[in-house]
């Protein structure tokens, strides 16, 4: 993942199919922040990857409605524009799979994707389509495509 601090972080994220609405090199929806690499046991990577693979086989693409633009951050974090997303039934079910890994200081799941610095949200799509789930372990990332419909 791009951004300061991510090189030491462990998370599970959803990756979108388009990037025209963001200024980030690798836009994502953080499904669960697990913690810092040094604070989690190394074997957790295998557990996260297994759960992500199972989730990818169980879920199809997620087309999630955008509610609007909001500002996130502050304190020791830069303030950014983010697209707030509807917590759909499918998204919440996917999040529940990974709840036990939550190492975030925020207990509530607040689905959003970062656009860039404040004032940079010039394109606001109606929905964002996510077709992959990724396990991010610092600079390492493994991604799985969601189940695709038979053609």
Task: Name what the model sees in each region.
Residues 1-151:
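Histidine-dependent nucleotide/RNA phosphoesterase domain, centered on the 2H-phosphoesterase fold
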């Amino acid at each position: 993942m791009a951004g300061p601090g991510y090189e030491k972080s462990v998370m599970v994220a959803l990756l979108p199919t388009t990037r025209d609405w963001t200024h980030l090199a690798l836009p994502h929806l953080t499904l669960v922040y697990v913690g810092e690499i040094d604070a989690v046991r190394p074997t957790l990577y295998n557990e996260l990857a297994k759960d992500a693979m199972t989730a990818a086989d169980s879920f199809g693409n997620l087309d999630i409605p955008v509610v609007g633009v909001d500002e996130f951050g502050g304190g020791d974090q830069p303030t950014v524009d983010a697209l707030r997303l509807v917590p759909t039934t499918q998204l919440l079910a996917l999040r529940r799979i990974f709840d036990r890994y939550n190492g975030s200081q925020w207990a509530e799941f607040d689905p959003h994707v970062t656009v860039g610095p404040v004032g940079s949200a010039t394109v606001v799509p109606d929905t964002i389509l996510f077709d992959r789930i990724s396990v991010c372990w610092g600079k390492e990332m493994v991604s799985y495509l969601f189940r695709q419909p038979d053609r």
